[in-house]
Amino acid sequence: MLQVEGLYLCRGSNEVLHDIHLQLPPGQVVGVLGPNGAGKSSLLSVLCGELAPDRGRVTLQGRPLADWAGQERARRLAVLPQVSSLGFSFRVEEVVGMGRMPHGTGQRRDAEIVEAALRAADAWHLVARSYLALSGGERQRVHLARVLAQLWPGEEGSTLLLDEPTSMLDPLHQHTTLEAVRRFADCGAAVLVILHDLNLAARYCDRILLLEQGRCHAFATPEAALTPAALKAVYGIDVLVQAHPERGHPLIITR
C-alpha cells in the first residue's frame, strides 16, 4: 500500500501541497480532482518519487519510498504521466514491451503479457504499427498498455498512478480506459487516477480526493465528496447532484 502522511511541498516561496494524508488501499481506485493549479500533478510527482516532499512521509508497503531500489520499485509501482512522448519509430509492441524491462520473466511470457495489456487498453489492433504514426489518443492507449504490462496482472502489492489518462480520448475510449483501470484494481492493485471529468470520477472511483489550492477539501466516497456545496467551494460552479437512474452513482449536472 502507498501511504502519505503530513505531506508538504513548496516551489520557491509557494506552498503547493499542504498537510496531505492519503492511503491507496489494494483493490481500490482513488480519483484526484481539483481545478487547474490545485496540486494534482505535483502530488503524483511526489508519490512516484520524482519530487521529494519538504515535510511528511511517503511509504510503499511500509518502507520509505526513497529506500526502494529502481527495478524493485518498478516491479511494484508504475506511473503514466500527463504527457508521454517518444521520438523514435518503435513498433507498438516494443513500446508496451518496455514495461516488462524490470522483470526477468522471459520473452515468451512477456509477449503474452504485452498482448493481454494491449487488449485491455483496446489497442491490440495497433500492435504492428509505428508509434510515430499513431494519433494522440492511440498513443495514450498504448502508454496505458505499457504501464499495465509493467504491473501485470495487477495483484495486491501493485500500485498504478495515472495522470489524466483520458485527456486525449473520445467518449468511448474514456470509458474503455477506465473500465480497464477498474478491472486492474479488482485484481488487487491500488490505483490513483487524476481526472477532470467529475462524472467519470463518480462512476469509476471508490474514493475521491478533492484538492483546493494544495489542500484536501474532501477525501471520501463519491457520494460524500461530490456534493453541490463542495463543488461550489472548489470549482465555483453551481451543480445539481442526483443518483444515476441505472447505476446509482452521483450524476453531476451543471446548472
From Swiss-Prot:
> Which InterPro entries does UniProt cross-reference here?
AAA+_ATPase (IPR003593), ABC_transporter-like_ATP-bd (IPR003439), P-loop_NTPase (IPR027417)
Q: Which GO terms describe its molecular function?
A: ATP binding; ATP hydrolysis activity
For this record, an example GO cellular component is: plasma membrane
Any keyword Translocase?
yes
According to the entry, every stretch annotated as the ABC transporter domain falls at 2-238
* Top-rank lineage group of the source organism: Bacteria
| Annotated ATP binding sites | 34-41
The annotated topology with respect to the bilayer is: Peripheral membrane protein
Residues folding into a coiled coil are: none
Q: Which family does the record assign?
A: Belongs to the ABC transporter superfamily. Heme (hemin) importer (TC 3.A.1.14.5) family.
Which proteins does it associate with, and in what oligomeric form? The complex is composed of two ATP-binding proteins (HmuV), two transmembrane proteins (HmuU) and a solute-binding protein (HmuT).
> What does the record give as the function of this protein?
Part of the ABC transporter complex HmuTUV involved in hemin import. Responsible for energy coupling to the transport system.
Q: This chain belongs to which protein, by name?
A: Hemin import ATP-binding protein HmuV
- In its UniProt entry, the species of origin is given as Pseudomonas putida (strain ATCC 47054 / DSM 6125 / CFBP 8728 / NCIMB 11950 / KT2440)
